[in-house]
């Protein structure tokens, strides 16, 4: 990564604060649950390769950076990669009015030409909490347990009470709960 160059004025214009980072399944992109002053939740996606190979500002203003539609006063919610092209974001509605439990799914390869944001391709009510996905299924975990959703149908297909995973391994198709000093796995 190139060093910071004194006198580089680009950094003075930045008002973006980074949040949780989520690596895409192929390891090529990052999803960031960040925000701007006001505060406005502003999730963005950018190329990890562009970032580490030379453009230290890729996450801020690089050519691969794509913003997912933002929400005032709403960040640090459930996010996950559905596959290498799609991300799921928890929350439907507007936080100034009413947010309902559910997810919005965005295609990060096809920006909306009118807004220049990632294009919303699916939305369905229900999921809330920590999110995980395998391309076909979306998993949402909260204090009551794990809910399993069909992404294509937007329907609840299963529930495991008392199992609230904090980690997901796409490689061996397992979800893990690490509460109470033990690790519980569920293979699907």
Task: Place the predicted regions along the sequence by residue.
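Blade-terminus and WD-like Trp-Asp/Gly-His loop motifs, strongest in beta-propeller folds
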Residues: 21-28, 78-86, 130-136, 167-172
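Beta-strand C-termini and the immediately following turn/loop, strongest in propeller blades
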Residues: 32-37, 85-97, 139-144, 177-182
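Surface-exposed loop and turn segments in beta-propeller and other repeat-based domains
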Residues: 1-15, 56-73
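Conserved blade-ending motifs and adjacent loop-strand segments that build the rim/top face
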Residues: 65-72, 116-133, 153-172
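Structural motif
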Residues: 38-46, 96-105, 143-149, 181-187
């Amino acid at each position: 990564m190139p060093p910071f160059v004194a006198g580089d004025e680009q950094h003075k214009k930045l008002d973006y604060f980074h949040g949780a980072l989520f690596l895409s399944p192929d390891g090529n992109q990052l999803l960031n649950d960040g925000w701007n002053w006001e505060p406005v939740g502003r999730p963005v996606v950018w190329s990890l390769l562009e970032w580490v190979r030379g453009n230290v500002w890729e996450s801020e203003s690089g050519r691969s950076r794509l913003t997912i539609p933002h929400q005032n006063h709403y960040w640090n919610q459930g996010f996950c990669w559905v596959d290498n092209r799609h991300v799921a974001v928890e929350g439907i509605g507007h936080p100034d009015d009413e947010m309902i439990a559910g997810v919005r799914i965005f295609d990060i390869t096809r920006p909306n030409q009118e807004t220049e944001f990632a294009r919303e391709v699916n939305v369905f009510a229900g999921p809330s909490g920590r999110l995980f996905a395998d391309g076909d299924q979306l998993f949402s975990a909260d204090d009551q347990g794990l809910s399993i959703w069909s992404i294509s149908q937007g329907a609840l297909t299963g529930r495991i009470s008392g199992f609230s995973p904090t980690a997901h391994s796409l490689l061996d198709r397992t979800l893990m709960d690490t509460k109470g000093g033990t690790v519980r796995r569920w293979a699907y």
